[in-house]
Amino acid sequence: MKVVILAGGLGTRISEETVDKPKPMVLIDDKPILWHIMNIYALQGFADFVVATGYKGEVISEWVSTLKSPWNITPVDTGLDTQTGGRIKKCMDLYPGEKILATYGDGIGNINVKKLMKFHESHGKLATLTAVRPPARFGYLDMKNGQVIHFGEKNQSDAGWINGGYFVLEPKVSSYIHAISEPFEIGALPRLTNESELMAYEHSGFWQPMDTLREKHDLEELAREGNPPWLREI
């Protein structure tokens, strides 16, 4: 089963790291975050990857050509200005009739892909996304009449659910993407929702995007501590 990884964006919010390389090639513990994402799948038996490239895609292609790995990795140039929906569609159209796994090239977590697949197969809809809790960035205050009565750290579980990627997509999802200039989150996902064809697999475990330098440093700290949650066998 193909795993499509979206790896073509500019990474403007972490531009200090993406002047000479695409965001998925930013290093976490001496390996690109792209490697960590692929390893999440490979540890669970999914090792046939299609990497949708765009900005500085040649850096990814060169890295793949020198990588010593049992994984099957196919970089696909999906265009510099193509949006996430277009990148998914271009990759899906290369493999007509195939169900795919897909995710973003900048978010890692200890997602149980086999449980995700089982959930998808149980409901019979066209698409499943993985719903996650956004990482808590701020503490909280309880106040009464201006006096602080409790000061604490916000738990990740206190926040609502968001789209964390890690999709399962049936072949027909390609027809819900109407233009390569259309973000998947603005076009296809709302259309699928309106037709009751989108389900959410709730993941309460570890999940962390790498949108900022602070988040990169947080991931590096977890990696340096040894046995980070996304590298453990699930």
Predicted regions and their residues:
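Conserved N-terminal catalytic core of the sugar/cofactor nucleotidyltransferase
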Residues: 2-5, 13, 27, 31-104, ...
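A generic "binding-loop/recognition-motif" signal
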Residues: 10, 21, 56, 134, ...
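Conserved catalytic-core motifs of eukaryotic protein kinase domains, centered on the activation segment
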Residues: 16-19
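A structural signal for short hydrophobic beta-strand segments in well-ordered beta-sheet cores
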Residues: 25, 140-143, 200
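Conserved beta-strand termini and adjacent loop/short-helix elements that scaffold enzyme active sites
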Residues: 54, 76-78, 130, 201-203, ...
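Short beta-strand-to-loop element that shapes/binds the nucleotide-sugar donor at the catalytic cleft/hinge
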Residues: 55, 128-141
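Catalytic-core segments of class I nucleotidyltransferases/pyrophosphorylases
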Residues: 99-101, 108, 114-121, 133-136, ...
